[in-house]
Structures are given as structure tokens and as C-alpha cells.
Amino acid sequence: MAAKDVKFGNDARVKMLRGVNVLADAVKVTLGPKGRNVVLDKSFGAPTITKDGVSVAREIELEDKFENMGAQMVKEVASKANDAAGDGTTTATVLAQSIITEGLKAVAAGMNPMDLKRGIDQAVIAAVDELKKLSVPCSDSKAIAQVGTISANSDATVGELIAQAMEKVGKEGVITVEEGTGLQDELDVVEGMQFDRGYLSPYFINKPETGAVELESPFILLADKKISNIREMLPVLEAVAKAGKPLLIIAEDVEGEALATLVVNTMRGIVKVAAVKAPGFGDRRKAMLQDIAVLTGGTVISEEIGMELEKAGLEDMGQAKRVVINKDTTIIIDGTGEEATINGRVTQIRQQIEEATSDYDREKLQERVAKLAGGVAVLKVGAATEVEMKEKKARVEDALHATRAAVEEGVVAGGGVALVRVASKLAELRGQNEDQNVGIKVALRAMESPLRQIVSNAGEEPSVVTNNVKAGEGNYGYNAQTEEYGDMIDFGILDPTKVTRSALQYAASVAGLMITTECMVTDLPKGDAPDLGAGGGMGG
């Protein structure tokens, strides 16, 4: 086992604070509408330019092991805030730095660290309750666009696009961000159920100009098995041919003579058919087939429940207004499933989301809800260069998370104003002893730090502006973009309550642990192996 280096008391805390400050100072230059960019060097390719706090935090590793521990703990604050709300990472870092700096001053002055932490925790619990009282629901497109704009660093086009996307696919819809091909940002909305499986044979294509298969009012056969024998299919094909409608087959696979026969039938114009593989794998495939069945009003032909393909009739088929299939996606538009059944299925999947333990499962279930309930929107980010594209895509993703958080828990006045108002409401809060009162004061003073940093980044004097904002009430604050005072809601400067709440909670949690640190242990750097000199031998 390697030898350890151990530091105690003030020595340890001073080193830790130095690390905290290096990371926080690098992150906080990005805060607010006049925050600056940070350039991150990469081992290959062009440097990354970002205004995203968590991206900056993740890059920082310090040479001194003790300082690095301090920096890594604050990095945890930014990461946790990012995971919980998808934004607010810079605010969380600024709050943590302030609580740690003021808290360690109090410890150096002889306060009891445990009581300080209790005071900080008490203030944060009270502050979260006050934030919830200040919160206003965010339901209209205008408010959603404003939240998106602020989070995308005052880029109004991004805010507008996100608001449009949410309007089209609903609050439950899936919105994804992709790199576009042009200079302009674009929004693509896919209505209906889309999944990532294309046609099994290019001979099914009936729209050569677009390279797609389009079926109008088709029957949809859903089979949870491989189909390789055409005999099983004959009764279904005959029934569909009589009805004079096209047929879409969604099965585990269609191969061999079955696929060949379907192709021949299509080319001769006997029955218009297309076949695709079912989406997903294993149990997820079964669930997604069931989703498609619910959406189209059909039944999954599965041997597990004693159904055979040969005995399937038209009543087992699903139907839709239109189906479009290209090389790697299938879209089912306007399935004929009953509204009540679809809603029941959505409720059932939501229940599974509540119980899901892994993020991956939760995300996949969320996608299934969106496909049944809303639709899918794709935001294509346009930029002139690769470097700008990466930076912009990260901003758009942040803005998307922020708008989701706003819809979930509502919004409060932005620009650091909500926390200043909360702090003034808690001015009379008291703990059980003087040290706890100091802890409460540390937390309340920290709540001013985001506003101070926004003002400082805008090149103004933080104390003057903070006092002016404190003298006002309600949503009265300072717009750093235009350098004027007024109602933050009227200015369109809104922050999601969830983002502000998460930033405060995670900052206080980690800062409290750091204030109560008395000892730090790390590996000693490994020295070079001693030089043994030349070995003894025969002279001359």
C-alpha cells in the first residue's frame, strides 16, 4: 500500500479552499447575459469553446492533491445540479463557493463546524419552501420561450424553437437535439409513432423519387415471431387482397421464401405489401409491439398466448391512416386505436417510469409515452463551424432541460432576484444557538452571490446593484443585458424553480460537508527509484 500524506485542521482547509476557488473562478466567469466564454484545450482537434458551467468544471484537475480534492467536491455540485435539472450548474458553483468561503472564515474564528452546518441546512430548507411559494406555473408558449432564451444565453431563436416544439408534441413529447447541416436552426416534427427500423427489401419501395414506401390506410399485421414459411401467411394475404387494401407486416423478422413471395406479390401488383422488423430487443420488443397494437387497434399474434399466424383474420389487424417507411425508419400516422385504450396504456407506462431504477430504462419508457401520447420533435442546430456547432448544441440542450424543469415546477424571477427575495424573507430566522445563527447568516449571504456575480460579469459594481435590488420588492431586479432596473417577469427574465432549488440544495449539501472537514488524506507522490550506481565487478 502506498504511503499517505495527511493534513489536519486549518492547513487542510486552506488547501481545500484554494482548490475550490480555482474551479469556481473558472466557472463563474460564464454566469449571466454578459458572462464570457471559456476555452478548453483538447488532446486532439480544435479547442472547445463553452459557456456551460458543468463543461468547464469537468475539465479541471489540479496538480496539488489536496487542492484537487476541494475542486473535485465542487465539481460534484455542478454535476449533481446538471443531473437533477439540466441547468443551473454555474449558479450552484457560485453558491457553493460563497458558503464554503464564509463558512471556513467562521470556523477559523472559532465557531463549531457542526452547528454551522445545522444552521446552513435549516436556512436551505426554509429557503426551498419560500421558493415554492414564489413559484408561478409556466404553461404558455411565451413563458416557455423566455425560459429557453435565458438558458441558451439570451439566444431568442433557440427559445422560440423550443416553445414551438413543445407546442407541437405536447409536454410529454420527446424533443431531441441534433447537429444540422445548414447555418440555420430548424425544427422537424414527426407526428405519429416512429421507430428505427426500415423496409426489409428495397423492392417494396413505391415512391422511387423519395426512396420510400408509402401505404395509404393499410392493415397492420403484428407478429412476435420470425416468419420464413409463406404457408402461414397465405390466409392473411388472401383476406387482405379481397379487402383491396395494402398490408404492413411488423415481425421479429421476415426471411427466406416468405420475403421473396411478398416481394413478387408486390411487384406484380397482386397485394401491396411492406415488411419491417419489430423495434427493440427481447422484452422491450414485446412491449413496443404491444404499444403499436394499442395505437392501431390490432392484436399481437404471439404463440405465448396461443395465437397462430395461420388463424389470424382481418379483425386481428391494426389499421392506420398512413404509413411511411424509408431505409431506416418507419412512421405510423393516425392509428385507429381507441383513445381510452391508448390513455390506459400511457398511464401504465408512466407507472413503470415511477418504479424504474436506471436512467436508461426511464429514458426508454419516456420515449414510449411520447410516441403514444404526443410525437417526436427534432431540433437541428445550424452553425458555420464545428467548434461553434458543439458550443451551440450544448446551449440548446441546456435550454431544453431548463424549459422542461420550468413546465414541471414553475418559474421564479430570474437574474438572481428570487434568491435575494428569499434571503430577505428569512432575515428573522434563528437557530438553537449563536453558532447556528452564524450558519444561517452564511447561507443567506450566499443567496446574494449569484446576483453579485451576474452584475460583476456585466462590469458594474455588485454592492450598489445588490442594495438597489434589496430595496425593491417582488420581481424588481436588475437586467444586466440592458443595464436597467424593473420587473424581471416583464423583462422576460425567468428561471425555472427546479433549477434554482437544485442549485441551492446541492451547493449547501457539499459545502456543509467541506466546512466540517478536519483531516484530509491523499497518496504521497511517488519519487523516482533511487539510483543504485554501477554494480561491483572485476577492475582493470
Curated annotation (Swiss-Prot):
Q: Which NCBIfam families match?
A: GroEL, PRK00013.1, PRK12849.1, PRK12850.1, PRK12851.1
Its name, as the record gives it, is: Chaperonin GroEL
- UniProt organism field: Erwinia aphidicola
GO cellular component terms given for this protein: cytoplasm
Instruction: List the keywords (alphabetical).
Output: ATP-binding, Chaperone, Cytoplasm, Isomerase, Nucleotide-binding
- EC number of this enzyme: 5.6.1.7
SUPFAM superfamilies (UniProt xref): GroEL apical domain-like, GroEL equatorial domain-like, GroEL-intermediate domain like
- Where found? Cytoplasm
Q: List the top taxonomic levels of the source.
A: Bacteria, Pseudomonadati, Pseudomonadota, Gammaproteobacteria, Enterobacterales
| UniProt main location, coarse | cytoplasm
Under catalytic activity, the entry for this protein gives: ATP + H2O + a folded polypeptide = ADP + phosphate + an unfolded polypeptide
What is the role of the protein in this entry? Together with its co-chaperonin GroES, plays an essential role in assisting protein folding. The GroEL-GroES system forms a nano-cage that allows encapsulation of the non-native substrate proteins and provides a physical environment optimized to promote and accelerate protein folding.
